[in-house]
Amino acid sequence: MAQSAEQIVVTGGWPLNGTVRVPAAKNSVLPLLAAALLCQRPVRLRGVPRLSDVECSLALLRGAGCTAQWQGSDVALSGSPVQSTLPGQTAAQMRASILFCAPLLARLGRAETVLPGGCRIGSRPIDLHLTGLARMGVQELDAGPGRLVLLAPSGLHGAEITLRFPSVGATETLLLAAACARGRTVLRGAAREPEVADLADFLNRCGGSVEGAGSSTLIIEGRRALGGCVFSPLPDRIFASTLACAAAAAGGRVELTGCSPELYAPVLEILAQMGCRVERGGESVQVARFGRLYGAGRVFTGVYPALATDAAPPLAAAMLCAEGESSIEDVIFERRFACAEGFAALGGRVNTAGRVLHIRPGGALRGTRLSAPDLRGGAALVLAALAAQGRSQIGGVAYLDRGYADFTEILASLGARIYRETKTA
């Protein structure tokens, strides 16, 4: 029996022009959905993008016994968890499923899940999560390969915890655990990312007590219970970065509204150095490229406020179109540049050495068949295809659906020759 799958078809060589409003950040929405498990009153999240990872999170909430439903572009959440075992098939699909364990431990004293999935971009251990939870009274049972069973037999209690690396996921997990733990938790070495501050803001709006968000030290006074609220998540700085890089790669002028340029300033600064015209104004940015792009030299990712690791592949796609040499090193994940194989298939002169992607000028990009290796690498291949001459077909669309809502429609509205189709194998 024939199997069908979607692919993205791009005819490159067309500039982008127009305005796009930046949607809510996936990396903010997912921990907010997990945080709703702590709330004893209804929660409404406004303007949530319809992503497959969001749908997985809603399925996890329903599996725990909560009500989670779409109301237009909002998500309405209510009810208390009654089931401590997360649906295995759903939990395995995304890394953020680990975030749901901390609220279940706080509410039910137990959490069971499969080890979380997500993009294969390198080692993504959860040892920092588990070490911190152990300091708060959590025990890990031997549940066999691929499973995680956590118990808090005496409930969660506050603790002083120092992270050896400012992991966003570990910071969010421990913040969620501490919000309803007994006593005070002091978390040092915490991630400073805006999405962490957004989670802290949400918890405070629901009656929690979190101080120091945006700094490397968080002080959380545990509450017996949290209420609810109506909350608008932070705009998506990675989506904005991707569209800014699309304008650089394809040429033209794109205005991005509803997202502070400070959230993705490193990307904008690098694009400006490469020859793009970048005009900032309040909550909007215009990125224009009508002439040549120049090499960026060597750039590095890092923890916030440095260049975000998730923005590295789209930025690399823009570098493919430059006349000078560029290299980009990701210090977070060792397999961040799996998209390099696709870049080479398009004609790019690229090579990888460890965590570094080297890009040399002179490669004439021509359309070809490609497959997205992961979420951000897939977006990078779409951007490179926009700059290539001829037709490209990009498989692995499910990766893109995890983090970009209506991606092809948005690019088409800007003038790209792009659409999705179902292919039959």
Stretch-by-stretch model annotation:
Residues 1-425:
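Short, structured segments at the rim of ligand-binding sites
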